[in-house]
């Protein structure tokens, strides 16, 4: 398992459930196509799982 993961916003949050919008914002994703590098821990994995249709995840 990688130490860090790259998460990229690939789908717009227009029309998304407000809870999902807040989760995406908490991950640091503000604009379409933005990529952030996050630690690969349980909290990050859970947040990414909740917004899986909106993001792409790659191990670093």
Swiss-Prot record:
Keywords: Ribonucleoprotein, Ribosomal protein. The keyword Ribosomal protein applies. One of its GO terms (cellular component) is large ribosomal subunit. It holds the Pfam family Ribosomal_L30. Signal peptide: none annotated. It comes from the Bacteria. One of its GO terms (molecular function) is structural constituent of ribosome. GO terms for biological process: translation. InterPro entries: Ribo_uL30_ferredoxin-like_sf, Ribosomal_uL30_bac-type, Ribosomal_uL30_ferredoxin-like. Gene3D superfamilies: Ribosomal protein L30, ferredoxin-like fold domain. Part of the 50S ribosomal subunit. HAMAP family: Ribosomal_uL30_B. Belongs to the universal ribosomal protein uL30 family. This is Large ribosomal subunit protein uL30. The gene is rpmD.
């Amino acid at each position: 398992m990688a130490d860090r993961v790259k998460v990229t916003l690939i789908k717009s949050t227009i029309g998304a459930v407000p809870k999902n919008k807040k989760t995406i914002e908490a991950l640091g994703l503000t604009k379409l196509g933005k990529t952030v590098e996050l630690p690969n821990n349980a909290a990050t994995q859970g947040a990414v799982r909740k917004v899986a249709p909106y993001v792409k995840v790659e191990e670093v």
